[in-house]
């Protein structure tokens, strides 16, 4: 199989969301993203402005997270966070859905929450994290149906801060429900180039990982 490394690198959100991340680490993240041609860097809101500065003059976008990592904030809080992040220069917002409401089957609440946040995005792209490791297969299907009904751009598997990351089953279920109507981001736990390539073949459009450099270097040796 012919592997287009440049194309795959441009599917990566190069991620550093650890609570102890330092400014020097964010600068390194941004430099790697420029060097490898990653699509974006994903950083906590505090580092949006620094990342914008480090990426100045490049095509790499800034992605951030809201309601992260538990999703348990009120809609009003998530909307405020979103507006603040967009004002500070974020191009993409990865929100965590209210997982309690999702598991209760409250579709109206979840769709409304996503749509209120999308309005606050003011044109920024919105990805909805549903934390698949906490969901049954039926709940994963429901999560995908909710995102399909909403104005979000992407459904995303995981925060990387819960019990597990993306699985092949997650991507298969999402793809079956959303088809080509929404995009899919696989995040967390993608450790090998084989996992990476399988996620993409199953329908992942974007990859969230802190191992971007390692994975691309691995592809070069394939």
Swiss-Prot record:
Example of a GO cellular component annotation carried by this entry: cytoplasm
Keywords per UniProt: Cytoplasm, Lyase, Schiff base
Catalytic reaction annotation: 2-deoxy-D-ribose 5-phosphate = D-glyceraldehyde 3-phosphate + acetaldehyde
Enzyme Commission code(s) on record: 4.1.2.4
Pathway as given in its UniProt record: Carbohydrate degradation; 2-deoxy-D-ribose 1-phosphate degradation; D-glyceraldehyde 3-phosphate and acetaldehyde from 2-deoxy-alpha-D-ribose 1-phosphate: step 2/2
Positions of the catalytic residues: 94 (proton donor/acceptor), 156 (schiff-base intermediate with acetaldehyde), 185 (proton donor/acceptor)
HAMAP family: DeoC_type1
Stored PANTHER family: DEOXYRIBOSE-PHOSPHATE ALDOLASE
Listed name of the protein: Deoxyribose-phosphate aldolase
Species for this entry: Malacoplasma penetrans (strain HF-2)
């Amino acid at each position: 199989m012919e592997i287009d490394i440049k194309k795959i690198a441009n599917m990566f959100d190069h991620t550093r969301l650890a609570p102890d991340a330092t400014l020097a680490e964010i600068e390194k993240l941004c430099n790697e993203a420029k060097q490898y041609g990653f699509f974006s860097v994903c950083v906590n809101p505090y580092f949006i402005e620094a990342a914008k500065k480090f990426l100045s003059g490049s095509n790499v976008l800034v992605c951030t997270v809201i309601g992260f990592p538990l999703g348990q904030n009120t809609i009003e809080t998530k909307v405020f966070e979103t507006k603040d992040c967009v004002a500070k220069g974020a191009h993409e917002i990865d929100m965590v859905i209210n997982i309690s409401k999702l598991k209760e089957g409250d579709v109206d609440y979840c769709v409304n929450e996503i749509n209120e946040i999308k309005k606050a995005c003011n044109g920024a792209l919105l990805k909805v994290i549903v934390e698949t490791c906490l969901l049954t297969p039926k709940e994963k299907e429901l999560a995908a149906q909710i995102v399909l009904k909403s104005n979000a751009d992407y459904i995303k598997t995981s925060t990387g801060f819960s019990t597990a990351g993306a699985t092949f089953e997650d991507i298969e279920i999402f793809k079956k429900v959303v088809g080509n109507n929404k995009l899919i981001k696989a995040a967390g736990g993608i450790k090998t180039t084989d996992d990476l390539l399988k996620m993409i073949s199953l329908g992942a459009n974007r990859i969230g990982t802190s191992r971007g450099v390692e994975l691309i270097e691995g592809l070069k040796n394939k």
